[in-house]
């Protein structure tokens, strides 16, 4: 206690001594008197004007799963059987909902059913007005092929395409192409695309990963920054992608929640949009009535890869009463994931399941297929077994056994049926080092382009008159003899006709359709009496010596596989388009020359895996990527 008092007295003594010294120095005011830090003087500043935030549509995703909650606060034990059972029931319910969404919808739908009632009345009216009258200014297949000049092109020596007039004209118009509009058309990854043949509108139909078909009117709409037409500071700070024209886009739920693998227009009526999906159905969207209906359905577990429909102006046999699977204009060919080719006659009322004619032509999945326009009995396939094959479907119909039930996998394929198809109906094949993903015939029928996963694009040149198999040729001769009336005298046809196929080009060159039964009978007889091509004139290997184009095709898991597509206007210099891993859309000539590479550093930030061109007008290209975004390129006026 005494020590603490001594300490306190010493402390107080020091305080008094310090105060005395500070009084003598005159600094009793503390640190403020001796120049210590003082508070800063605040000068009034002009208040900063806050930028008015731009109103954006609410894009907050709807939460599907329930909100997280505490099981402890709810009174559940950590290893409660009741809680486990609850979670299992919720998972099972979610699985059933997902499976039901992927299950095919066989009923017809109107516009409100395809939009789910989410579109406003004004948007629906705008869509209906866009779809009306699209087929008024479209061109038929016969108008796109100048067949009288085609014989001269085949017989004459072709000049070097580097110096040809057609090549220079094509390069000139391709070099004028610029990006006109860009927009998000579908909610998910784009799988397929088709350009409407109308010359009045740039209307594109886009299929995505979950059964939606986006309708995009790609015509650019002028951007208005504000009501007065004067850009403000806020407008200048906006991203260029938001200011860029987008056109108009609508989304229709045509199929179930499965990828739309192929979209094509009916060659008879361009107001009908045909589409296939992994839900194993083919549906028709009527643009005039804005209704969708199913036209064919297969087995639920057999996925559809691609299809093609024969054009009525390809041959006169469309007028025959008996459907011919190689020449009927209402014939649809479908390739599936089990290695099968299916033939459908659209005039048949029953078009479901095992009633369809099917042939097992490949061991594994067929990823792509194309029907030759000038030789419709020839079908090219690209499959997972690393082959591109050419088949004569006349031999399929006559000597190859049909396989109504698709095998579950490649182990269930009947070896005898497969060997019969590949030895009797197949007449050419080309093997790649890895899987083949794309194949497409040119509109002139004399060139074929294929894409494979070994980073190469191949282009073959061929004569349509040499695209046949021995058994297919025998079938044609037998059919002609059986259909020929007694006492008929064979017409003398010039030898040059045999070089281009049995009456196909002459049929295409007709300016007027056949109006009477007599004209129809004469046209059919002319095709039947045409001299048959000879096996001795056909090359030993039709798919030999292709033009090889190095191309990175490693799209991986999250991108749609690249597909090379020819421009369908046969009057132009042959050229095709394909996507690129360098985020460019590329245009190639038939000889492998890169004619144009399209890219915009500000607006194209993803790989444009899917491409398509206008079938009539030159240099009009649309691309699509994995986010559902499309770009539209066309020449400057």
Curated annotation (Swiss-Prot):
InterPro entries named in the record = WD40/YVTN_repeat-like_dom_sf (IPR015943), WD40_repeat_dom_sf (IPR036322), WD40_rpt (IPR001680), WD_repeat_DNA-damage-binding (IPR050853)
Spans annotated as Disordered: 1-91, 144-168, 482-508, 525-549
Recorded superkingdom: Eukaryota
The record, for SMART domains, names: WD40
Q: Tell me which Gene Ontology terms the entry assigns under biological process.
A: DNA damage response; regulation of DNA damage checkpoint
Biased composition of type Basic and acidic residues is found at 8-23, 74-91
Cited Pfam families: WD40
User: Cellular component per GO?
Assistant: nucleus
A GO term, aspect molecular function: DNA binding
**Keywords in alphabetical order:** DNA damage, DNA-binding, Repeat, WD repeat
Tell me if Protein transport is a UniProt keyword of this record: no
Which windows of the sequence hold WD repeats?
185-226, 255-295, 297-321, 361-401, 431-470, 556-598, 602-637
State its role: DNA-binding protein that binds to both single- and double-stranded DNA. Binds preferentially to UV-damaged DNA. May be involved in DNA-metabolic processes.
Q: Which family does it belong to?
A: Belongs to the WD repeat DDB2/WDR76 family.
Q: This protein is called what?
A: DNA damage-binding protein CMR1
